[in-house]
């Protein structure tokens, strides 16, 4: 098996190194990752300029683009052989609920799915994570499970791991995405020249975080595994929308 690894924290991030070290005894590993931190890049592709891919001192391939760029290049011609699946992570921080819309880590996995490969995004749920060995062990266990029972090519698994020692984990939970309240206000300040600047505010607090959600699983010291889909259509509203639209509507 040939596994492509990427992330959004950059090619030198401890989480990516931990993931590569954990999976390399089990499969052929190729790492293609951003040359710098691109957290929050979501599914953006770089279209206004060419991209450069270079071999870093640690042997990883670094790209001067987004996580989506990295996976796209890797699968569509950068590599000599196409990988069989994509692992993205280990992200430095949770990707729970609404976070998946912004996450470059989840986007890297999503791009793998767009290009026909099963993909796993794995995140360590803490602001300053420490227990990368726990998330690495989870990645090993999931890979072993995938080998026993392969994932369909249209599968994206969003995995969040509590930042605790491995022996404190309380198992795995199949979860749905929770939700957050509205994000906090931007932080308004001034640069050294007195010009107004803004920092994006913090994510909103939990809104939908009850049993069955990814938030709840993490609070219970369980690994949260959420299956994601690409189709964002809200099917139960199609008929209502058709009745609401002005003029003649055709299906």
Swiss-Prot record:
Q: Which UniProt keywords apply?
A: Cytoplasm, Hydrolase, Metal-binding, Nucleotide-binding
Show the Pfam families listed in the entry.
Answer: SurE
Q: What is its EC number?
A: 3.1.3.5
Q: Which SUPFAM superfamilies match?
A: SurE-like (SSF64167)
Textual note on the cofactor:
Binds 1 divalent metal cation per subunit.
Cofactor or coenzyme needed: a divalent metal cation
First-level EC class: hydrolase
Q: Where in the cell is it found?
A: Cytoplasm
Q: Which reaction does it catalyse?
A: a ribonucleoside 5'-phosphate + H2O = a ribonucleoside + phosphate
Q: Which domain of life is it from?
A: Bacteria
Which residues hold a divalent metal cation? 8-9, 39, 91
Gene Ontology MF annotations: 3'-nucleotidase activity; 5'-nucleotidase activity; exopolyphosphatase activity; metal ion binding; nucleotide binding
Q: Does the keyword Cytoplasm apply?
A: yes
GO cellular component terms, semicolon-separated: cytoplasm
**Functional description taken from the UniProt entry:** Nucleotidase that shows phosphatase activity on nucleoside 5'-monophosphates.
Q: Which family does it belong to?
A: Belongs to the SurE nucleotidase family.
Name assigned to this protein: 5'-nucleotidase SurE
Which species does the entry assign this protein to?
Methylococcus capsulatus (strain ATCC 33009 / NCIMB 11132 / Bath)
**The organism's taxonomic lineage, starting at the top:** Bacteria, Pseudomonadati, Pseudomonadota, Gammaproteobacteria, Methylococcales
Q: Which gene encodes it?
A: surE
């Amino acid at each position: 098996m040939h596994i492509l690894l990427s992330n959004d924290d950059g090619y030198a991030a401890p989480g990516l190194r931990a993931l590569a070290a954990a999976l390399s005894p089990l499969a052929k590993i190729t790492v293609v990752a951003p040359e710098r931190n691109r957290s929050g890049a979501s599914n953006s592709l770089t279209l206004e300029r060419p991209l450069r891919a270079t071999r870093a001192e640690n042997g990883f391939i670094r790209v001067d683009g987004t996580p989506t760029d990295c996976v796209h290049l890797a699968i569509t011609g950068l590599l000599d052989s196409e990988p069989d699946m994509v692992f993205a992570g280990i992200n430095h921080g949770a990707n729970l609920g609404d976070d998946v819309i912004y996450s470059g880590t989840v986007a890297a996995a999503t791009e793998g799915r767009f290009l026909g490969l099963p993909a796993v995004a794995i995140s360590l749920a803490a602001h300053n994570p420490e227990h990368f060995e726990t998330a690495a062990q989870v990645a090993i266990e999931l890979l072993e499970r995938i080998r026993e029972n392969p994932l369909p090519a249209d599968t994206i698994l969003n995995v969040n791991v509590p930042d605790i020692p491995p022996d404190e984990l309380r198992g795995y939970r199949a979860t749905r995405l929770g939700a957050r309240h509205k994000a906090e206000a931007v932080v308004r300040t001034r640069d050294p020249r007195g010009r107004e600047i803004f920092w994006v505010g913090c994510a909103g607090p939990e809104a939908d975080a009850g049993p069955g959600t990814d938030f709840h699983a993490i609070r219970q010291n369980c690994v949260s595994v959420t299956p994601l889909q690409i189709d964002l259509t809200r099917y139960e509203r199609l008929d209502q929308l058709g009745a609401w639209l002005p003029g003649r509507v055709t299906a």
